[in-house]
Structures are given as structure tokens and as C-alpha cells.
Amino acid sequence: MHFKKTLKKERQVKTMAKKKIGIIGGGISGAGLAYHLSLYEGEADVTVFEKDTIGGASTAKSAGTVCLFDDSLKNRYWDVRLYGFESYLKMEEEEEGSAGFDKTGTLVVATNEEVEKVIKTGIALAKAAGYTGEYITDKDRIKEILPDISTENILGAGYTEDDGYFDGTMISNTYMKKAQKNGVTVKTGVKVTDVKIVDNKVKGLTTDDGAEYEFDVVVDCTGPWSKITGEMVGLNVPIWHTKAEAFFLCPPGKKLDYTFPVLKYPEFYALRAGDNIFICKSHLSMDLNNPMHAGQWDPDKLPATGGTDDYFIDFLLDQLDAKVPGIVDSGLVSSWLSYRAEPKDFWPVLGKTPVEGYMLSTGFGGNGVIEVPAATRDLAKLIMRDESTPLLENWAFERLLED
């Protein structure tokens, strides 16, 4: 009798309908979610819709820094940082170059006691996880790591040689290849034009080729486009655009004779990009009330290169003059503008919305490469098991609703 009941239960599981999930957006958020959903073998029927190419748009313009300790992610989310970092290291172990890892190390400068405290806590967490890290107050030692830095007006610096930066486009494509291998359908060059809602519940979506699809769940992974995407279901997604204006400098002498680490100050960051140096104003230093920093713009009108403002290059050159004077005379090689999707509290928006079956995985701002692995892992669990996690609760849509 027990054997018959077991067989009956197994048949029921085999014949159980798969949950049909549509993902809008093939950047790092959509790719990460597709991969984590694909791990629910035989339970999810997943289709990704990307209007252009996988890992393009804002993902392609990401700096890709995943530092073991800095101010981009509070230490309370250390597990999120570590999961992302080790996910990409695993990719690299499986296939060298699949995450685009450049192991330059990171130097995080302490400009005051509050920053110093954050750095020291981060170093302790990194060392507890088996990585190297040291807090340096010897100014000569700091200049050994970064000869062009000014050590005036700083307390010290945290340093590790274990991390560096990754490539968001490579990561996205690696995630998507893994997802496809597990049965996920990926449609590129296909734009979603409408999401079908009946009685405040998702029923499916329509694409620009006139095709209609039925889904139980639709997830918006469109980043800077989320406000536009949300309008399809009558949802006001509360995000702003902040300008990510990146500049590529050619150092004096054309090529540095040392490895330029990822350099982090509260106001800006820099890293090597081939023989050049990439610099950008930090996303946490952006003012959502400053129209030069933030607003609501059309991401479709972004140029592939250029589009930057004199305001930002002047700001960054002033920062270099005071803090890294050895490279301030660099030549400007190129620049680009991207829009970050930022909620008012600078944390992502994950999970359920007031529209049943319509979920969000957006608002990662400047931290997408860091946060996406843990965020989409937990979101996949919510979609497939209806189980929440502390991370999903902290980054839920409802926190942003006005009182």
C-alpha cells in the first residue's frame, strides 16, 4: 500500500504544471534571476525577453567592482557581498575569463574616523572568511601600493590584494548560458510592449513582433527602464536616475609601471582599464535633489559614448588633484554616460508589488554586480516557494510606499 501511494505521489509531481515565468530584461539582474530559477529543475518554465543583447545597456557600462571591503555596501550585508564575490570566483574556476576578473587588489582610503571604522570592520570580516586584508597607517607603505597618491589629510587605508573588478557583460552571458543549458528560453532583439493584467493579476505579455505569451509571474529586470516598464501595469516604480559619468584617462608617460588597484574614496573611485584609468563619481555621493545628479530621463536616448557633463570631469579632476596628484595630468581618452536606477534610500527593490504576479528586481544603482547573485537567489526562492528572506524583507517594494 505504501509503495502504491509513493508511486501515485511521484506521478502527481511529474504531471504538476510548471510555473511559467517571464523575465523582462537581459542585463545582469535578468540573467542572474534566470540562472537561479533554472536550478529549480523541472519546476519552472522561464522565458527571458531582451530588446537588445544580453549584458548590454547599463550592465555593459558597469565598473564591475566587487571589493571585499568598501562603503558601497554596508557591513550588515557582508553575506551579500561575499556570495557575489565567490559566485564570480567560481565562474572563473569553471572557465577562466567567464566573469572577466582582473585581480588588481583594492585600496580603500580612510578620510575620517567614521570611514576608518567601516574599513576596519570590513577587513575583519574578509579575514574571517579566509581572505587577506590589512589596515595601513604607514604613509610610505601606502605609497608603495599606489605611488601617485597623496597621503596628506588621510588617516590610513585598507588594502587587500585578493579582489579587483569583474565584467558585468561577461557575467550576464555566463549566467544566461548556464540558464539556457538548464532549459531557459532566451529571446534577444524582442521588446515587450504590454503586460496583460486581469483583475489586478498578471496573465501574460505581448512583444513587438505581435506574439502573446501566458505567464504566472512576470519580473521586471529592466533597471533604468523600470519606471517605463511599470507603467504597463499601472505601477509607479519609485526610482530615480542618477548619472554615472565615467572618464578614461591616459596616464602621464602613457603606461604606469605598477598595478593600479581599485581605489576607493567616499567621493569617487578609480580602477585600471587596460593601460588607462577609469574614474567615476561614487553613486552614494549623488544627491537625488540635485538636477545635475538625478532626475527622470529616457535611457533609450543615451549615446554609446560621450554625453558627459563638464561638471563631472571638473569635479573628478579636482578630486585627483587633491588626492592622486600623480595622475592629474593624464589625457582624456574617452567618456560615457549611463543612468543608474536608484530608489530614495539607495537600496534595490525586490519581490512582490501591489499587482499580483508582477515582481521587481531593479534599483541596484551602482551595486548591481555586487548584489545581484544573492538578490536573485532569494527572489527565485520567493517565486518558486513563496518563501521570503530577511534580504527580501529589507528590500521590499512596500518600504517605498508613501505614508
What are these model-predicted stretches?
Residues 17-19, 208-217:
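Core beta-strand elements of the Rossmann-like FAD/NAD(P) dinucleotide-binding domain
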Residues 17-29, 47:
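Beta1/beta-strand and adjacent pyrophosphate-binding region of the FAD-binding site
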Residues 35-39, 64-66, 97-101, 105, ...:
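Active-site substrate-recognition segment that forms the wall
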Residues 38-60:
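Glycine-rich FAD pyrophosphate-binding loop
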Residues 64-145, 267-269:
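Dinucleotide-binding Rossmann-like beta1-alpha1 core, especially the glycine-rich loop
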Residues 79-82, 109-118, 159-177, 305-312:
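Short beta-strand to alpha-helix junction loop
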Residues 159-209, 213:
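Helical element adjacent to the flavin cofactor pocket in flavoenzyme catalytic cores
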Residues 318-403:
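C-terminal catalytic lobe of FAD-dependent flavoproteins
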